[in-house]
Amino acid sequence: MVTIEPVKDSPTYPLLDTEYIISIIDQHASDTAVLLLPGIQFYSGQLFDIKTITAHAQSRGIFVIWDLAHAVGNVPLQLHDWNVDAAAWCSYKYINAGPGAIGGLFVHSRNSQTSAPVFQNRLSGWWGSEKATRFAMTNEFKPTPGAAGFQLSNPSIMDLTSLCASLEVFALSDMATLRERSIRLTGYLERLLVALQAEVGQFTIITPRDPTQRGAQLSLKLEDGLLDVVMQELEERSVVVDERKPDVIRVAPAPLYNNFGDVWVFIQAFAEALRVALTVKEKNAVLPGSDKLLQTI
């Protein structure tokens, strides 16, 4: 297995340029069967050029699968039109179906594999068999065309119910409208963060500044020794964000239910949290040999 990792000395670290990804594909194309990449990178929040990367990898004879956990419900996707071979995702992030909810699968129609003898190279559970023959008990697998043919067993009714409830909300709008609102929300967040950075410092935005290269998320890399106190202070102010050790927090205003007022409240809380964390860090720095954080006042 070959991993595609950002170059640490690169001025764009930790981002991955499309050209760099393509160069790694070319370097290993002769002995690569499958390319698996995230649509949006979970750590940096970078949105990859799915269409371009897919086309290039396929031109080198590589089967392309996308992990869309952080992309589905976040950015518009046209998997069939982009000729993606297959994709998978969860539904508890931007789809809002809740933890443990059922995931999703896309399989391009050309990869349906509905005729023998290729069935042995695929998932072939009984729930993926055609409905007309599913209970015939012939010991013969006849898959349903498309992603449905890759199901193994009947899904949980409770999981489906929570997903359907969320999809009903999405159906009241469309991804183009949600994406437009998301760009404005995250753009507003970015603008306030840039102003705070100039005033307080102590963090950098590592997510691409180009809205077309990101979703709702902005990842903020904190200066050393601030993360734990910042997270504690945000929690005490009823602000929920995500942390990635050792020094990154992920902030994602969701266009379905967050508004510009929420973004403003976050910035005020984050500014206060940074100031408290910096004070604690400075106090600890004058205590030789201390390996414990002082309690915040």
Place the predicted regions along the sequence by residue.
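Pyridoxal 5′-phosphate
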Residues: 1-297
